[in-house]
Structures are given as C-alpha cells and as structure tokens.
C-alpha cells in the first residue's frame, strides 16, 4: 500500500512522447521534472523560481513559448535535482494560486528540446486554439474565436459583439437561401420551354388580329369586323 502513495501518478499520458504506456510510466518513475500548466502569459521566470524553490533546489526552469512569436504561452517545465523535492512540489504547490490563477503541477517524463514550444496551429497551446471564453491572462479569446471576430470586424469596418456576429451570420445564410429559392425556377424561362400563360396570350392575340382584318396566308386582307360607319366593300 505504501508503494501506491510513493509511486508518481501522472494525470495524463502524452501520446506524442513516443513511449508505450509502460515505457511512459517507467520514465515517470525515474523523472524529477514537473510540468506546470494554466499559467498566465505574464508570469515571469523569476516568479516561478521564487515559488517552486520553496520545495527544493531547482536545476532549471524551461518556459513554454509560442512556436511563432517566441513569447510565453502559459506553461513551463521545472526540473528538480531530487525526486523527493519534485514530489513535494506536486503535493504542496499543485492547485495553488499564482498571478490570480490556480496552476496545475503534474509529473513529466523529462524535457527534450522542442517541447518548450506550443503544439497549437497558431503556435500556442492547443487549449488556447478552441477556448471560447475571454481570459485576459492568456491573451483574451481563443485563437479560433479571435480569428472569427477579426473577420467580422474587417467586413463590417469596426468592432462588433459576438452576439452581433452570430446574428449577421444567420442573416447572411438566410439571404443566401432566399436567393437560391428565388432563382430555382429561373432557368426554365431560358431552357426553350414555353410558358403556358404566354401561349394563351399568343393565341388570344392571333384571334384578335384575325378578327380585325389581319392577312391570312394566300388571301387578301379582310375588313375589320367592326365598322365605325357604313361603308361599301371594295
């Protein structure tokens, strides 16, 4: 039972580590590295040293960086010299508050070059790609949400609320549907098919023309059926 409490229990399995789950567990058992998440983008390395050194001597801290901007993006790795100090870090610092944020500390299998960069499409962390809430400590809205808002802002020439964006999107979709419905029967007018109403009008016109003395094929013109005064036929 004592081994259950002394063996590190990571909260996640990093599928991109290249390890099997057994290999990952073995690496965790030997590691004295801590992953720290939910940090503010504005938390400094000096602040991290001040906090995490309370649990033991620190070998180094590796700040997590935006892959493109090379600026802090909300996580770091803390390497201790001893595994006991790393265990104390998880025991006492995990869930504590730093820069008005509850931070998360978890066992890590060990830092490798390249892991300091965010894995998100825009360069930061994946969690900040799809986040829909506004978090001033992590750059405002999530990247995807901010991209959508910027598109609406550019189209409309200024800042608009998210609710207005959704309303405009719905209106645009409705207008597109109405346009498609209005033009659904349009091609028939140009396909060579005659409109029945147009045929009726044409027949009526022909009868009126014949009745008023139009020229029939092979015949001489006829006088109009209705006369305004008595006249002799030629």
Curated annotation (Swiss-Prot):
Domain named RRM is located at 32-110
Question: Which biological process, per GO, is one annotated for this protein?
Answer: mRNA cis splicing, via spliceosome
Q: Which InterPro entries match?
A: NCBP2, NCBP2_RRM, Nucleotide-bd_a/b_plait_sf, RBD_domain_sf, RRM_dom
Q: What domain of life is recorded for the organism?
A: Eukaryota
**Bias (Basic and acidic residues) ranges:** 126-136, 196-210, 225-234
Region annotation (Disordered) ranges? 122-144, 177-234
Annotated residues for binding of mRNA: 12, 35, 104-108, 115-119, 125-126
Going by the UniProt record, its keywords in alphabetical order are: mRNA processing, mRNA splicing, Nucleus, RNA-binding, RNA-mediated gene silencing
Gene3D superfamilies noted in UniProt: 3.30.70.330
Where in or outside the cell it occurs: the entry states: Nucleus
Composition bias, kind Polar residues: at what positions? Answer: 182-192, 211-222
Q: What Gene Ontology molecular function terms does this protein carry? A: RNA cap binding
Q: Which Pfam family, any one of them, does this sequence belong to?
A: RRM_1
Q: Which GO terms describe its cellular component?
A: nuclear cap binding complex; nucleus
Cross-referenced SUPFAM superfamilies: RNA-binding domain, RBD (SSF54928)
> What does this protein's UniProt record list under function?
Component of the cap-binding complex (CBC), which binds co-transcriptionally to the 5' cap of pre-mRNAs and is involved in various processes such as pre-mRNA splicing and RNA-mediated gene silencing (RNAi). The CBC complex is involved in miRNA-mediated RNA interference and is required for primary microRNAs (miRNAs) processing. In the CBC complex, ncbp2 recognizes and binds capped RNAs (m7GpppG-capped RNA) but requires ncbp1 to stabilize the movement of its N-terminal loop and lock the CBC into a high affinity cap-binding state with the cap structure.
* Similarity remark: Belongs to the RRM NCBP2 family.
Quaternary structure and interacting proteins, as annotated: Component of the nuclear cap-binding complex (CBC), a heterodimer composed of ncbp1 and ncbp2 that interacts with m7GpppG-capped RNA.
Name by which UniProt lists this protein = Nuclear cap-binding protein subunit 2
What organism, scientifically named, is this protein from?
Dictyostelium discoideum (Social amoeba)
